[in-house]
């Protein structure tokens, strides 16, 4: 049984229409296999093509540039009368330019490789990888469960001279995870007023 190239990109719900090869790149054109309403699951939908998307996928062998092309559709459900732009399951958000699989690979390699080395290897912009890492860290540390905090560390740092006096920040961290719990202006007890509420 032949394995289609788009399976290596962890793409489901699409089929391969065409493939173009060159020395350093592969372009895979995809087509949705079945359209259904995301709310009621009905397949009785009207499909309206909106635009074509081109995103980057994981490298295949010596081909570092893998492009996936597909058309985004607007769906109208005849059962529940809901109108919505279709969800693409292999993208982390509607405006993503990389597949979830490539994003995951970059995030797994990032602790071991510099941003510039990853950008050079995948032929991406430095800012693309930096933004991906920032988004991941924000998601990871945005929801800190204060019930699980066993020990905190409080640090006051000098950030420079202001108009009339010295300026400080007070940083409160969870010592186990290293997550920042609170950043307060100034130093002393007044900078910790919000933190003490948990």
Q: Predicted segment positions?
A:
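Short, conserved DNA-binding cores of transcription-related domains
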Residues: 1-82, 88
């Amino acid at each position: 049984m032949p394995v289609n190239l788009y399976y290596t990109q962890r793409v489901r719900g699409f089929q391969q229409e065409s493939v173009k090869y060159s020395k350093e790149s592969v372009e895979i054109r995809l087509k949705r296999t079945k359209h259904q309403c995301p709310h009621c699951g009905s397949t009785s939908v009207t499909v309206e093509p909106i635009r074509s998307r081109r995103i980057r996928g994981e490298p295949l062998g010596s081909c570092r540039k893998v492009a996936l092309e597909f058309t985004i559709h607007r769906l109208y459900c005849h059962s529940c009368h809901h109108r919505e732009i279709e969800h693409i399951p292999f993208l982390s958000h509607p405006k993503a330019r990389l597949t979830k699989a490539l994003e995951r690979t970059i995030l797994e390699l990032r602790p071991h490789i510099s941003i510039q080395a990853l950008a050079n290897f995948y032929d991406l912009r430095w800012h693309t990888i930096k933004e991906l890492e920032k988004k991941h860290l924000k998601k990871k540390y945005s929801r800190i469960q204060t019930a699980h905090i066993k020990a905190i560390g409080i640090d006051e740092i000098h950030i420079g001279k202001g108009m009339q006096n010295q300026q400080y920040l007070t940083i409160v961290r969870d010592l186990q995870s290293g997550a920042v719990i609170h950043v307060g202006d100034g130093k002393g007890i007044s900078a910790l007023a919000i933190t003490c509420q948990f």
